[in-house]
Each structure stands twice: as structure tokens, then as C-alpha cells.
């Protein structure tokens, strides 16, 4: 409640019973909200992993273009990451008064801890590094907004994300402010530093990958959400979202494996399927088309892992609208 030692406060009875009860209530609200968000994030990762079929990606039928991971690897990874999503939300609450520009450096250590937990759970396999980055930022932004709502409780009876896309845009804009200038890490690369895959792809093609998507406030995810909401309610909507993301995302995971030609193949094939009304509206036709696409991706050793991360975030954002 204050900067003083709890022992000293207790002896002097500095805080009234009402103040103590109010503080307990506030902290309970914060933890409950953080747990709610963490569960939605966890469920989004699980739903994305289990969605089948997914071209080139691990699903319940096969391991896609991967030899070192399976569906159970992703499930174990998601379990390991769930507590960290809670901590990201709480971090957003605790740092609510800090400038936006200070947040990234504050949450980076927690992100690195989450990565280590992932590697322990998966026996050193990178299942969710991109998701940790995206969800860490979004969960922190949600915590920040929740804390600011708590400070205005008298004028608003409950905290909720807008039932249209306004709330999603607000959270995404906050992430953009958190990450402003993050792509400078690619632009101002020192020749004395190790040459990473991300740096190489930026130098060759100007692709900014996950950094660029976050810095712009996840425009592809926001577009995918709008695309889904513009369609009739259907159990196939997550497949539509995945195809939309694959068609429009300059996925550095694909370029790393298959070069610019591999990316062009993925985008062209996804666009083709999005343009086929029969595929979109007929479940059997869509499943058959996706299985064919999956076979082609596996044959070319292509995996749209970046789009998979964005799909998980799309699922998460949609769940916020309906929770």
C-alpha cells in the first residue's frame, strides 16, 4: 500500500481497515483478471496447434515440415508458458505509470525466462518464441489498460474489451507504442555482431518480421479479425484466417527455408484458395484443398510459422470479444 515496511505500518496502524480491505480487493481483481487473460492466451495457443489440417505446420494429423516437434511438443510448451502470461499482465499493471518507451526493456527479462521455460518443456525445441514475443506485449498492454480502468472505477462499473474491434485496435496501438523503434535493431546492425537469420533477411529483402508487425500494431492480425467478422459465422473461420495470413504475411520463417520463391508459392496458393468461393463455403472441399496444400508444403519443406503465431493471436483477439 505504501513504501514503508509492513511491520512498521502494522505497529503504527497507519492504514485503516477500510483501506486494507480496499487494497485486498484491488489486488484480487488484478490477479483474477491476469489469470483470465492467461487462460485465454493458453487456449489460443492450444486451439492453433490442434487446428487440422494446417499447410506445412504441426497439427493432429502430421508434423508438417518439421522433424523435431509434434503436437504434444506444442501442448507441453503452451502449458509451460501459461504462468508467464499471468506475469506479463501483472507487469503491465505494475508499470502502468511508466512511459510507453520504457516497457519493452522492463518485460524483456520476463520474455527470456519464458523462452527458457519453453526450451525446458520441449527439450530445446523452439515452438513458441514468436508467440512469446507477441503475447507478452499484448498481455502487458492489457494489464496497463486494466490498471488504468481500476483508477477510474467510480465512472465505469466493469472492465471489458469493446464488443467491436475498437478494443482490439486500442490494445494494438498500445503495443505499437511499446515497440516504437524496435526495427532499428535491424537497420542499425553492427558488423561486429553475429549475423542472425532475421538480420540477413532484412538486408536481402527488407523484411522486418515479428518486430515490424508489432511495431505497426499487428495490422495483419487486425485485418484477419475484420475478415473473419465480415464472413458468416462458421466453424471454418480459423482456416479462413490462416489462409488470409499466409496470403498476406511476408513470413520470414518461409523465406529462411525456401527463399523468396518459397514465399511466393505460399502466398499464391493461399490467395488462390481464398478466391475460391466453393473452398470457403464447403467444409469438405476446403479440407481437401488444405490437405493438398499441406502435402505441397511438406514436399518443399516450407512452414509458415510466422503466420501460425499470428493466427494464435487472431484467435486470442476474437476470444476477447466474446469473453
From Swiss-Prot:
A Pfam family reported for this protein in Swiss-Prot or TrEMBL: CitG
Keywords associated with the record: ATP-binding, Nucleotide-binding, Transferase
Listed EC numbers: 2.4.2.52
First-tier enzyme category under EC: transferase
Superkingdom per UniProt: Bacteria
GO molecular function terms noted in the UniProt entry: ATP binding; triphosphoribosyl-dephospho-CoA synthase activity
Homology family: Belongs to the CitG/MdcB family.
HAMAP family: CitG
Name this polypeptide is given: 2-(5''-triphosphoribosyl)-3'-dephosphocoenzyme-A synthase
UniProt gene name: citG
Amino acid at each position: 500500500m505504501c513504501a514503508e515496511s509492513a511491520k512498521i505500518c502494522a505497529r503504527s496502524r497507519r492504514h485503516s481497515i477500510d483501506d486494507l480491505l480496499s487494497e485486498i480487493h484491488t489486488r484480487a481483481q488484478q490477479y483474477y483478471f491476469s489469470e483470465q487473460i492467461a487462460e485465454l492466451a493458453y487456449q489460443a495457443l492450444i486451439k492453433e496447434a490442434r487446428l487440422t489440417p494446417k499447410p506445412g505446420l504441426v497439427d493432429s494429423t502430421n508434423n508438417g515440415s518439421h522433424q523435431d516437434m509434434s503436437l504434444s511438443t506444442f501442448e507441453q510448451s503452451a502449458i509451460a508458458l501459461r504462468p508467464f502470461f499471468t506475469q506479463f499482465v501483472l507487469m503491465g499493471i505494475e508499470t502502468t505509470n511508466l512511459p510507453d518507451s520504457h516497457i519493452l526493456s522492463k518485460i524483456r527479462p520476463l520474455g527470456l525466462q519464458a523462452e527458457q521455460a519453453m526450451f525446458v518443456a520441449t527439450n530445446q525445441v523452439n515452438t513458441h518464441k514468436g508467440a512469446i514475443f507477441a503475447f507478452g506485449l499484448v498481455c502487458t498492454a492489457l494489464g496497463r489498460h486494466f490498471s488504468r480502468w481500476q483508477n477510474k472505477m467510480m465512472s465505469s462499473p466493469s472492465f471489458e474489451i469493446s464488443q467491436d474491434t475498437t478494443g482490439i485496435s486500442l490494445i494494438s496501438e498500445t503495443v505499437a507504442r511499446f515497440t516504437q523503434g524496435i526495427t532499428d535493431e535491424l537497420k542499425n546492425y553492427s558488423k561486429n555482431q553475429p549475423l542472425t537469420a532475421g538480420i540477413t533477411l532484412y538486408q536481402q529483402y527488407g523484411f522486418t518480421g515479428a518486430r515490424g508487425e508489432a511495431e505497426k500494431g499487428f495490422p495483419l492480425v487486425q485485418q484477419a479479425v475484420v475478415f473473419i467478422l465480415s464472413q458468416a459465422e462458421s466453424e471454418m473461420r480459423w482456416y479462413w484466417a490462416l489462409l488470409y495470413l499466409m496470403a498476406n504475411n511476408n513470413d520470414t520463417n518461409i523465406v529462411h527455408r525456401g527463399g523468396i520463391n518459397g514465399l511466393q508459392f505460399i502466398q499464391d496458393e493461399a490467395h488462390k484458395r481464398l478466391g475460391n468461393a466453393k473452398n470457403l463455403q464447403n467444409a469438405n472441399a476446403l479440407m481437401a484443398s488444405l490437405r493438398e496444400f499441406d502435402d505441397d508444403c511438406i514436399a518443399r519443406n516450407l512452414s509458415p510459422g510466422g503466420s501460425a503465431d499470428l493466427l494464435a493471436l487472431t484467435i486470442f483477439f476474437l476470444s476477447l470479444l466474446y469473453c
